[in-house]
């Protein structure tokens, strides 16, 4: 069984992924993120067909503490965030969380 990529975010954020063929997405308008983002993340985490969740880094600030901890600690599906100011260190942390070791450790 192959696992799919799911994208969660504003329609502006998800559109490019949908055009690229990503079939699973949750559109949450910017003005509704504080109310609806937790539910969208929970639904996606519970979807057994999803292997990777893509979100914008800034959207994590709209999640409740419990939802944020759930998505950040999830191994499968794995969270990948884009944008924001995390840069290479954010990617390093995501890789370390996903596989359990720091590949860039010197």
Curated annotation (Swiss-Prot):
Subcellular localization, as worded in the UniProt entry: Cell membrane
A GO biological process held by the record: proton motive force-driven plasma membrane ATP synthesis
Key words, A-Z: ATP synthesis, Cell membrane, Hydrogen ion transport, Ion transport, Membrane, Transport
Disulfide bonds, paired cysteine numbers: none
One Gene Ontology MF term: proton-transporting ATP synthase activity, rotational mechanism
Record-linked SUPFAM superfamilies: AtpF-like (SSF159468)
Topological relation to the membrane, as annotated: Peripheral membrane protein
Record flagged with keyword Transport: yes
GO cellular component: plasma membrane
InterPro entries: ATPase_V1-cplx_f_g_su (IPR008218), ATPase_V1-cplx_fsu_bac/arc (IPR022944), ATPase_V1_fsu_sf (IPR036906)
One Pfam family matching this protein: ATP-synt_F
Protein family membership: Belongs to the V-ATPase F subunit family.
HAMAP family named in the record: ATP_synth_F_arch (MF_00312)
Function: Component of the A-type ATP synthase that produces ATP from ADP in the presence of a proton gradient across the membrane.
Subunit structure: Has multiple subunits with at least A(3), B(3), C, D, E, F, H, I and proteolipid K(x).
This protein's name: A-type ATP synthase subunit F
């Amino acid at each position: 069984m192959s696992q799919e990529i799911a994208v969660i975010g504003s329609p502006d954020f998800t559109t490019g992924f949908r055009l690229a063929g990503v079939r699973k997405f949750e559109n949450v308008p910017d003005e509704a993120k504080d109310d609806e983002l937790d539910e969208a993340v929970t639904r996606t985490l519970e979807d057994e067909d999803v292997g990777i969740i893509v979100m914008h880094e800034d959207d994590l600030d709209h999640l409740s503490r419990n939802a944020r901890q759930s998505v950040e600690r999830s191994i499968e599906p794995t969270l990948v965030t884009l944008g924001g100011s995390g840069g290479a260190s954010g990617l390093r942390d995501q890789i370390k969380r996903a596989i359990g070791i720091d590949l860039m450790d010197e």
